[in-house]
């Protein structure tokens, strides 16, 4: 059986169509894999940013608490100094007369 020219052209057409379909499928698989990798990397980046934000907020909170404690300590120190001056005045009335 000899293959006629028309049959040869038809087989060639099917072969080229099969190659094109196979390349399209492989291209889609590669595209979907790259998209999956991109989404995973994006999710990792968002997770890292969330962790950094939490760390920054905790740092701001700690700094604020430290500042408030420092202000309270200054106020307490002022009270202690006032009490010490009053006590010194009470114990040493002759120094006021000078």
UniProtKB/Swiss-Prot annotation:
Segments traversing the membrane: 10-30
Effect of mutating residue 19 to I:
In strain: Isolate variant XX
Protein name in the entry:
Uncharacterized protein 98
Recorded GO CC terms: host cell membrane; membrane
- Asked if the Swiss-Prot or TrEMBL record annotates the protein with the keyword RNA-binding, the reply is no
| Topology of the protein relative to the lipid bilayer | Single-pass membrane protein
In which organism is this protein found? Sulfolobus islandicus rod-shaped virus 1 (SIRV-1)
Note the effect listed for residue 46 to V: In strain: Isolate variant XX
Record keywords:
Host membrane, Membrane, Transmembrane, Transmembrane helix
Name its cellular compartments: Host membrane
């Amino acid at each position: 059986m000899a293959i006629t020219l028309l049959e040869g052209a038809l087989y060639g057409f099917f072969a080229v169509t099969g190659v094109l379909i196979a390349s399209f499928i492989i291209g889609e698989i590669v595209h979907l894999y790259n998209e999956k990798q991109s989404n995973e990397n994006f999710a990792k980046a968002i997770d890292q940013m969330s962790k950094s934000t939490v760390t920054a907020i905790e740092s701001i909170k700690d700094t604020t608490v430290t500042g408030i404690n420092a202000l309270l300590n200054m106020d307490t120190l002022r009270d202690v100094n006032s009490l010490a001056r009053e006590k010194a005045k009470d114990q040493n009335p002759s120094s006021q007369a000078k």
